Amino acid sequence: MGFSVAVALKALEVSHGEVENALDLCVNGIITDESLEHVPTAPPVPVTSHGGMTTANRVMVRRVIDADNSCLFNAVGYCMEKNRRIGPKLRKIIADCVRNSPDVYTEAVLGKAPKQYSDWIQDPAQWGGEIELFILSQYYGCEVVAIEIKSAHAYVYGEGKNYSRRIYLLYDGVHYDALAMAAGSPTAPESLDMTQFPAGDESSKQAALAVAAELKEGRQFVDLLGCTLRCMVCNKGLSGQEEALLHARETNHQNFGEYKSS
């Protein structure tokens, strides 16, 4: 069964470079050329001029998004529309996309029947992930670069689609924040933030990676695999990924640290 270069690139992106997994996605028809065309597009988002300032006059900063189970959606919303309360709208866009393309977003892809997934993702208590970033990248027509603090790796959703712009998100293992270029100082008004960048802008990418590296050095990330954690909000001890995720969903606490016995 043949498949296009665009399909192969998208499969590699979704599988984080794991060739065997990417091949399965292509051969089994989970990612197809049709699937790359089934997402509605957002109305044009005006790009605000910031008085001619370039990234050289700016500093990359972390813009904190509320830990309300919609951090992924609101982080994207801040970068694209300067809106931290856009979760319900973006959840509905994703739900409609999944519901209208059941041949593309199959149960094998979603882990749930498309109708069930559409209902599930509109529940404000549920978290978004890679599928949502993939769809939102196509909806806005831009690359969404999610930088994982622990690995210092940049996962690019929309790579190879010839989009002209990109945004940056910061991921600590359970929570997404937005990254923005502040006007000269981290304390500059957020209204002057630059949140969209040319897709090929290496300087903004390196600045975003530098923020992640600094946070990694300070161990400001959550290692969910096999370690003992402590909730830094209520001080509860937790064991591994399942307990941490369950605690986060039940309490909205999303600040964890590794537990070290004295």
Question: Which residue stretches match the model-derived regions?
Answer:
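Short, amphipathic alpha-helical interaction segments embedded in low-complexity terminal/linker regions
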Residues: M1-S70, C79-K89, D96, G218-K236, ...
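Short, well-structured alpha-helical patches and their helix-loop capping segments
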Residues: A6-V7, P124-G128, Y171
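Alpha-helical elements of the RecA-like P-loop NTPase motor core of helicases
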Residues: E20, F73, D177
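Papain-like cysteine protease catalytic cores
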Residues: P44, S49-K161
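Deubiquitinase catalytic domains
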Residues: G129-E243
